[in-house]
């Protein structure tokens, strides 16, 4: 057992460190989502790996058919958890959990949602706004770019109350304003 006050590693490094296609894909994700390093991609992969493992265990439980009510309860619990997190749609099934890819996880990060909502010009600027305390969720300042935003919190993302960006005439904010539909999903 380890020391309980110390954080453990929340990601798993690749088994083959010099695999060209993987490196190119990770580099593309780092650039597209404005990540600091590939460790953030690996964290997202590990997070999804846990969900997929739970889904595979549920499928194994279903095939054994020992207790159908236990299977249904665990299935609905997993699906509803992932729907609240915003990773799955309303009519999702276990197959949708197994089909999830890393970009789905990276789209739920605060940094990405700040950029998608048009509060920043680029993913890198979105990261900077978050770390400098200019972004709030539901009125509470959040300074973690990797914070996973739930569906309920998604609509409450805005500039923090004491941030100079609250003023619409702020010089940087006028540069951020884009035409409708440009880069926003």
From Swiss-Prot:
The keyword rRNA-binding applies. Keywords: Ribonucleoprotein, Ribosomal protein, RNA-binding, rRNA-binding. One of its GO terms (molecular function) is rRNA binding. It holds the Pfam family S4. Belongs to the universal ribosomal protein uS4 family. HAMAP family: Ribosomal_uS4_A. Part of the 30S ribosomal subunit. Contacts protein S5. The interaction surface between S4 and S5 is involved in control of translational fidelity. This is Small ribosomal subunit protein uS4. The gene is rps4.
